[in-house]
């Protein structure tokens, strides 16, 4: 399937995965959230979302000046149907795709930007990314929904506005709206583009899920790494792109590998391949997925790659950057 496709009434979009090349916590905020520093890398691998646009229009308002009278939740229920997500959440309202559509409508109402007529849209999710893996699947679904419905419904918010809406849904949503590799700060919404070399990765997805709230509350989690300047991160990419050198790390790794034996096993498997791959294995996000950057020499050795995938202790995928 192509990454993105459009027919007369169906729009198909890749909802890509992400990995964190490193992940630091630099302190706790007054609002209870934590400040982070990371480099996000988007992957040419993920879920697919199919948006089918109906001919039927819903009259949303009597006039463009009457936005305040609209109930966005009720309107979203009329406008949006969702399939393929039945096993993810107990109800459509809890799904991040629906939440994204609802947040988009709410922002349009609040800014008096809601068009008078909107078409109904059916969204079908083809889920490929495992949940709770640190790959950003749900957040990517939300971001893709915001981007596509913003155009279908002709709300026409700019990227900065969509990023603000995305941040209200989840900390990882903004990077997928930004749409390119980036240095991230704050809770993940302060994004600076970064140019990184083309890269392929071996990604392992062990069946393990550790509650994120439990991780952030864990006594062994390091929460006070000294912040790095954007310039430092830009100028020292050799310390985290292929290898992971001090001070770069993923602070969640020791906590997660202690709590989840399957993650520890998967990471140890990749660590045994580091000498051949000429790189450093690591975990993405707060887990459970782990990955190994691959040297060009490894990529050309198809038999060796096939062996690594076959012998992996859990599902393994060969992917590249977006």
UniProtKB/Swiss-Prot annotation:
Signal peptide start-end: none
Superkingdom assignment: Bacteria
GO MF, one example: 4-(cytidine 5'-diphospho)-2-C-methyl-D-erythritol kinase activity
Pfam families: GHMP_kinases_N
Keywords, in A-Z order: ATP-binding, Isoprene biosynthesis, Kinase, Nucleotide-binding, Transferase
Catalytic activity: 4-CDP-2-C-methyl-D-erythritol + ATP = 4-CDP-2-C-methyl-D-erythritol 2-phosphate + ADP + H(+)
One GO process term, biological-process aspect: isopentenyl diphosphate biosynthetic process, methylerythritol 4-phosphate pathway
EC number per UniProt: 2.7.1.148
Isomerase listed as a keyword: no
Active site: 18, 172
Pathway where it operates: Isoprenoid biosynthesis; isopentenyl diphosphate biosynthesis via DXP pathway; isopentenyl diphosphate from 1-deoxy-D-xylulose 5-phosphate: step 3/6
Root EC class: transferase
Binding-site residues, ATP: 130-140
UniProt function note: Catalyzes the phosphorylation of the position 2 hydroxy group of 4-diphosphocytidyl-2C-methyl-D-erythritol.
Family named by the database record: Belongs to the GHMP kinase family. IspE subfamily.
Protein name: 4-diphosphocytidyl-2-C-methyl-D-erythritol kinase
Protein encoded by which gene: ispE
